[in-house]
Amino acid sequence: CIGCNICVSMDGYGLPIRCTQNPTISEEWRRKWHPEIVSKTKKTQDSFLIIGSGPSGLECARVLLKAGHKVTIAEAEKEAGGRIVKEASLPGLGEWIRVRDYRMNEINQSSNSEIYYSSRLSASDIKNFEADNIIFATGSYWRRDGVGSSNPHSCSLDHFNLYTPD
């Protein structure tokens, strides 16, 4: 837990619970479920190219590595983390960088992983890479139209100074 309170903030709106650290939250009903246990694959090891190293790309890589696959991450920026890097730079949100740090620590402990930074790939680059599987985890952005979990409709924000981490 990084203390971001995403889980409890959804309760007030009657929305399903979610978590920045545990993407399998609310899966407790599944037999033999545990958020940290990933079964090894029963088939041969596959190779995966993950394009993007934000929270979703890193979590995908972490789980695939635990399942015994070979993972290569191509990141367009100079560091991993995606938008979390910007969010963690905001006042009071410094601990959010743990979303990235936990996953990077797990990934770096694996001998089946490679990460390439400053690597913006073209379609031919992806095709020539010859991975068994390709996963696009190319990011998300803050909305600037006022729509959010507490406000499902857009509104005019033209007369406001609207700031986002971007």
What are the functions of these language-model segments?
Residues 116-129, 144:
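A conserved short coil-to-beta-strand element within the FAD-binding core of flavoproteins
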Residues 25-41, 106, 115, 143-166:
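Glycine-rich dinucleotide-binding loop and its adjacent helix/turn
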Residues 131-133, 137-146:
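Glycine-/small-residue-rich beta->alpha transition segments that form the dinucleotide
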Residues 1-40:
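Cysteine-cluster motifs in flexible loop/terminal segments that predominantly coordinate metals
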Residues 50-114:
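Beta1-alpha1 glycine-rich phosphate/pyrophosphate-binding loop at the start
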Residues 12-13, 60, 83, 145-147:
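Short glycine-/acidic-enriched loop or helix-start segments at secondary-structure transitions
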Residues 78, 116-120, 164:
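Short loop/edge segments at beta-strand edges and connector loops
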Residues 1-3, 33-51, 56, 119-120:
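Ferredoxin-like iron-sulfur electron-transfer modules
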